């Protein structure tokens, strides 16, 4: 899962949106650096990452990637799951329009920004102002996201080419998303993530 899904599942679980968004910027034990609600959000994010990577649907989808891109398949799939969530938001969350949800999430996260890591603050400058979460529905934007990650981290250069794997298996990936994401939503609502 990427930013949108983590925020959505955190909302469904009545968990810290800030902690769920911050988690990728925190290493080790967060308890000595952050408030308890943010720490719980960080741990929820980590549990979701492990769970998603181990889903039968995700394991199957990784096999569809070519040899040269399989190493980055988990990252590429995380971004792609957000694409499907954004694309189908009106079906998934009919009572909370995506634009309203993004405004709500931004307000939640903005309260903690001044005290958090500079890289996280920098991400937030772009995430909200450039409307990334809404733009995830556009496959051209997904390609830009993958290219941007490859530019920032040269060892992940294969992300550029992973776009072709997404394109080749788009319909099958979308089907897999519909297999697992409603289950994860139900787990979040039961606070079982």
Swiss-Prot record:
Superkingdom per UniProt: Bacteria
EC number: 3.1.4.14
Keyword set, alphabetical order: Fatty acid biosynthesis, Fatty acid metabolism, Hydrolase, Lipid biosynthesis, Lipid metabolism
GO biological process, one term: fatty acid biosynthetic process
Reactions accelerated catalytically: holo-[ACP] + H2O = apo-[ACP] + (R)-4'-phosphopantetheine + H(+)
Entry annotated with the keyword Lipid biosynthesis: yes
GO MF: [acyl-carrier-protein] phosphodiesterase activity
Presence of the UniProt keyword Lipid metabolism in the record: yes
NCBIfam families referenced in this protein's UniProt entry, alphabetically: PRK10045.1
Function in brief: Converts holo-ACP to apo-ACP by hydrolytic cleavage of the phosphopantetheine prosthetic group from ACP.
Sequence similarity: Belongs to the AcpH family.
Protein's recorded name: Acyl carrier protein phosphodiesterase
Originating organism: Salmonella paratyphi A (strain AKU_12601)
Gene: acpH
């Amino acid at each position: 899962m990427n930013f949108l899904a983590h925020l959505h599942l955190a909302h469904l679980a009545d968990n810290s949106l800030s902690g769920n968004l911050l988690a990728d910027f925190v290493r080790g034990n967060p308890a000595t650096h952050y408030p308890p609600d943010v720490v719980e959000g960080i741990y929820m994010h980590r549990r979701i990452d492990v769970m998603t990577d181990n889903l039968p649907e995700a394991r199957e989808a990784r096999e569809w990637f070519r040899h040269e891109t399989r190493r980055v398949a988990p990252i590429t799939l995380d971004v792609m799951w957000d694409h499907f969530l954004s694309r189908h938001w009106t079906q998934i969350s009919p009572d909370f329009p995506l634009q309203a949800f993004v405004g709500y999430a931004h307000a939640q996260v903005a309260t903690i920004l001044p005290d958090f890591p500079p890289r996280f603050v920098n991400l937030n400058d772009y995430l909200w102002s450039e409307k990334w979460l809404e733009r995830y529905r556009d496959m051209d934007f997904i390609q830009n996201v993958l290219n941007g990650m490859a530019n920032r981290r040269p060892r992940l250069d294969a992300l550029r080419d992973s776009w072709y794997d997404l394109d080749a298996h788009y319909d099958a990936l979308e089907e897999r998303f519909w297999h697992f994401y409603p289950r994860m939503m139900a787990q979040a609502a039961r606070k079982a993530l």
